[in-house]
UniProtKB/Swiss-Prot annotation:
This is AA9 family lytic polysaccharide monooxygenase B. The keyword Disulfide bond applies. Is able to utilize various natural phenolic compounds as reducing agents. Most of these reducing agents are present in plants, either free or as lignin building blocks, such as sinapic acid, or as flavonoids such as catechin and dopamine. Phenolic compounds with 1,2-benzenediol and 1,2,3-benzenetriol moieties yield the highest release of oxidized and non-oxidized glucooligosaccharides from cellulose compared to monophenols or sulfur-containing compounds. Lignocellulose is the most abundant polymeric composite on Earth and is a recalcitrant but promising renewable substrate for industrial biotechnology applications. Together with cellobiose dehydrogenases (CDHs) an enzymatic system capable of oxidative cellulose cleavage is formed, which increases the efficiency of cellulases and put LPMOs at focus of biofuel research. Concerted enzymatic process involving the initial conversion of monophenols into diphenols by the polyphenol oxidase PPO7 leads to up to 75-fold improvement in LPMO9B-driven cellulose degradation. The gene is LPMO9B. Residues 1-18 form the signal peptide. InterPro entries: AA9, AA9_LPMO, CBD_sf, Cellulose-bd_dom_fun. It is found in: Secreted.
């Protein structure tokens, strides 16, 4: 009982300080940063599985553009606690936020304007595995622990049989440290905008968000501070063309070799209505909307915030945002 209580208290103590967001994307080892990510307004979780925020988080900012991806290639999603901080010195998602990592895709007509209401199919999951030496679920192997081991990175195979077109890719980490009561599970997700090229014709079965999860699902309403004999990852099964990772497995590929500033990078074309928009009055001016990036290390975009907001360093020197 004492061990359980201390573990629970430790998890609760880390609750407020260890929120996180998926931010950057690598495509076959090429660093696209956050250019095609709809960055959430904050690093706080979504807890209501019946809200539309369960699709792509609450009030995400428009992405700069769409990342080009070939069907059958590997993308690597990257999570960190603070906006713009891609350092490996801190856990990607700390505070004993243990749980699975899942990735979904949705075929859309235009990734820049899609609202996430179309169907989703799961292409990846890294869930749970028993630690024979552990005494509770906290001691077991989890997808979020793998994120922490791999500097926030998780490799995801894009199914080779997908047809060409625009897609949303939804990366999600589920923290279960307070999931012992209904509404306690914490969902951290970001949607990335992709343009996929391929010759496939697959049409995977889909689920809807909201709708795919229930607050009482066994993988959502669960006490991980007690010993676990099994765990069911929420949502549908992974599509046959996707991939899985066994919790506790070693970092591979880009998870272990990709490092910010030491490899190839790429820039995407700016989508209409994204981060920087023309300011009235001409003169080549631009305006950054509230909650969007306006500065930071390596940033070369617009720095003029829309009326009513100012450019503030939220994670110096990496990231500044209009607030």
């Amino acid at each position: 009982m004492k061990s359980f209580t201390l573990t629970t208290l430790a998890a609760l103590a880390g609750n407020a300080a260890a929120h996180a967001t998926f931010q950057a994307l690598w495509v076959d080892g090429v660093d696209y940063g956050a250019q095609c990510a709809r960055l959430p307004a904050s690093n706080s979780p979504v807890t209501d599985v019946t809200s539309n925020a369960i699709r792509c988080n609450a009030n995400p900012s428009p992405a700069r553009g769409k990342c080009p991806v070939k069907a059958g290639s590997t993308v690597t999603v990257e999570m960190h606690q603070q906006p713009g901080d891609r350092s490996c010195s801190s856990e990607a998602i700390g505070g004993a936020h243990y749980g699975p990592v899942m990735v979904y895709m949705s075929k859309v007509s235009d990734a820049a304007s899609a609202d996430g209401s179309s169907g989703w199919f799961k292409v990846f999951e890294d869930g749970w595995a028993k630690n024979p030496s552990g005494g509770s679920g906290d001691d077991d192997y989890w997808g979020t622990k793998d994120l922490n081991s791999c500097c926030g990175k998780m490799n995801v195979k894009i199914p080779a049989d997908l047809p060409s077109g625009d897609y949303l890719l939804r990366a999600e980490a589920l923290a279960l440290h307070t999931a012992g009561s209904a509404g306690g599970a914490q969902f951290y997700m970001t949607c990335y905008q992709l343009t996929v090229t391929g010759s496939g014709s697959a049409s995977p079965p889909t689920v809807s968000f909201p709708g795919a999860y229930k607050a009482t699902d066994p993988g959502i309403l669960v006490n991980i501070h007690a010993p676990l004999s099994g765990y069911t990852v929420p949502g549908p099964a992974v599509y046959s063309g996707g991939s899985t990772k066994k919790a506790g497995s070693a970092c591979t590929g880009c998870e272990s070799t990709c490092a910010v500033g030491s490899g190839p990078t790429a820039t995407v074309s700016q989508s209409p209505g994204s981060t920087a928009t023309s300011a009235p009055g001409g003169g080549g001016g631009c305006t950054v909307q509230k909650y969007q990036q306006c500065g930071g290390q390596g940033y070369t975009g617009c720095t003029n915030c829309a009326s009513g907001s100012t450019c503030s360093a939220v994670s110096p020197p990496y990231y500044s945002q209009c607030v």
